């Protein structure tokens, strides 16, 4: 919404899940920002401070939401000639994605992959990550990239234990 408020009116490509979340989240964020601006300005006027302007308004949030283009996983989108984009499941959180960007110019093709966290295999509720191949460049978040994660906990056994303890105490699940 902040770039929309400054005049950007182009399409915003995002996964379908991100589009759904942003519809709710951006309006909520705008509401919070407007409330905070009102509070800060009320307090600031008494102290002679300049007016606080929120990063964006509800109108900006509602406007930018109209520019979102939902992109299903695996579908190749062509936002401009010579450029194709494919969102794939990163398997990290519901709706997370890695992005494969292919650029063709002067008869050459370059593939760039952008990703945040990539999930583990065989997680409950979350699909395994889609692995991308033959990238020329990879731009990636790597907070825990220098660590070996070792053995993965047996989540089913842990959940079963919690359920059994709850029943043993007479609780409800």
Where are these regions (language model features)?
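His/Asp/Glu-rich metal-coordinating catalytic cores
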Residues: 1-172
């Amino acid at each position: 919404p902040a770039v929309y408020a400054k005049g950007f009116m182009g399409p915003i490509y995002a996964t379908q899940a991100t589009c759904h979340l942003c519809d709710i989240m951006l309006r909520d964020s705008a509401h919070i920002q407007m409330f905070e601006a009102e509070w800060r300005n009320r307090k600031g006027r008494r102290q002679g401070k300049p007016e606080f302007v929120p990063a964006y308004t509800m109108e900006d949030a509602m406007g930018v939401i109209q520019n979102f283009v939902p992109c299903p996983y695996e579908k190749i989108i062509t936002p401009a000639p010579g450029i194709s984009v494919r969102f794939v499941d990163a398997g990290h959180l519901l709706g997370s994605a890695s992005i494969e960007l292919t650029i063709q110019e002067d008869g050459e093709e370059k593939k760039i992959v952008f990703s945040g966290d990539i999930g583990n295999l065989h997680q409950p509720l979350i699909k395994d990550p889609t692995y991308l191949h033959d990238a020329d460049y990879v731009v990636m978040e790597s907070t825990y990239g220098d660590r070996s994660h070792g053995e993965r906990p047996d989540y089913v056994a842990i959940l079963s234990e919690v359920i059994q303890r709850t029943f043993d105490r007479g609780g409800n699940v």
